[in-house]
């Protein structure tokens, strides 16, 4: 089994920007890219325009840069030269994909960009691969509307010192 070429990354974590069937697709004036490089500054600017910015280490630019560099799937949405949305995922591509961040600028929310970012993420996965996410409190009602089902057994440990 192989992955779509636009979704593969090399051993050095330099992501491919080879077009897929939907690469550069313009939907309602928004252009979507698979694994296009983003700077920590671009990403943080977007997150500051969303509720997700409250829960990410925006002051730690090196950490943000590493989060972007090590993402397996990074889908970005652009309105001209302006970054308006990102879906950042960690995955094995075959069984499960953890959608770590789904961010859409509040200026363009309710336009279908989040749904399209998720659809583009699925284009990078093998059939049958599940997408898993933890919803922000403000987004709990959004995900069922677009097809996600609630799962009641998620667990979180923020530091190894909590391990007993």
Predicted stretch roles:
Residues 4, 17-61, 154, 164:
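Short amphipathic alpha-helix that is part of the acyltransferase structural core
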Residues 13-15:
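Intrinsic-disorder-associated, low-complexity terminal segments enriched in Asp/Asn/His/Tyr and depleted
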Residues 65-76, 129-130, 153:
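A short helix-loop-beta-strand connector motif used in the catalytic cores of GNAT acetyltransferases and
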Residues 76, 82-91, 96-103:
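Conserved beta-strand in the GNAT
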Residues 108-117:
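Conserved acetyl-CoA pyrophosphate-binding loop and the N-cap/start of the following alpha-helix
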Residues 127-133, 137-163:
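Conserved active-site alpha-helix within GNAT-family acetyltransferase domains
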């Amino acid at each position: 089994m192989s992955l779509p070429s636009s979704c593969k990354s090399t051993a050095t974590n330099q992501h491919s920007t080879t077009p897929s069937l939907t690469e550069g697709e313009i939907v309602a004036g928004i252009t979507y890219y698979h694994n296009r490089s983003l700077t920590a500054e671009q990403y943080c600017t977007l997150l500051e325009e969303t509720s997700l910015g409250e829960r990410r280490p925006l002051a730690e630019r090196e950490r943000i840069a590493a989060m972007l560099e090590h993402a397996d799937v990074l889908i970005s949405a652009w309105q001209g030269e302006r970054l308006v949305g990102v879906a950042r995922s960690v995955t094995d591509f075959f069984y499960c994909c953890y959608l770590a961040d789904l961010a859409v600028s509040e200026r363009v929310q309710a336009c279908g960009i989040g749904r399209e970012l998720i659809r583009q993420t699925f284009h990078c996965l093998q059939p049958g691969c599940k997408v898993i996410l933890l919803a922000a409190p403000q987004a709990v009602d959004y995900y069922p509307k677009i097809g996600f089902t609630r799962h009641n057994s998620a667990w979180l440990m923020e530091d190894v010192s909590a391990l007993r």
